[in-house]
């Protein structure tokens, strides 16, 4: 119900969409106790399409009691590429290059140095602490599709000036790469329990420029901030500590 109320996404929403893209039907209860249903199992159901209205309504329209979802087959293989950069602008450029090349990764996430430092103290994911920014780029599909896409991504990362590139060798290493990213918010909470999480979207080609602007504001206003976000769709999450 919470996912429906917020139209939640996540690290794999770049390829697989938000909650609304994976819903068929929602049942809920309105404030006056009326049981209502939105959506249908059929694609050509009559009437207004109100499912997108209730999805993301943050509980204002109904309390969700039942959800019918689409199921997507699990891919045969997934590999995660970890790339380190000595400059946030280069990392932002790499994101723009990947998307401009027509590649839609299963996930494309970015973390700056303060974020990776906080995460390493918390979960020990093996991130390169000397990097000013890291990218996590996941490819999934058949073994042949994954190999081809990883090769293209690696070439683009090298063109963008990556100082280190690692490809997960097995499922355990892939999960370890992602464990750090998924623990970023709890890791920030260990440093500052009352941090503020911002949420905004900007053009991917301006990511590096935006991160530099955030760094300038940190200096100007004597504040601390870590950045961990969905780079593939330009969705920033600066955490003000």
Show where each model-derived region lies:
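C-terminal substrate-recognition/cap domain of FAD-linked oxidoreductases
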Residues: 69-73, 79-241
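FAD-binding subdomain of flavoenzyme oxidoreductases
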Residues: 1-109
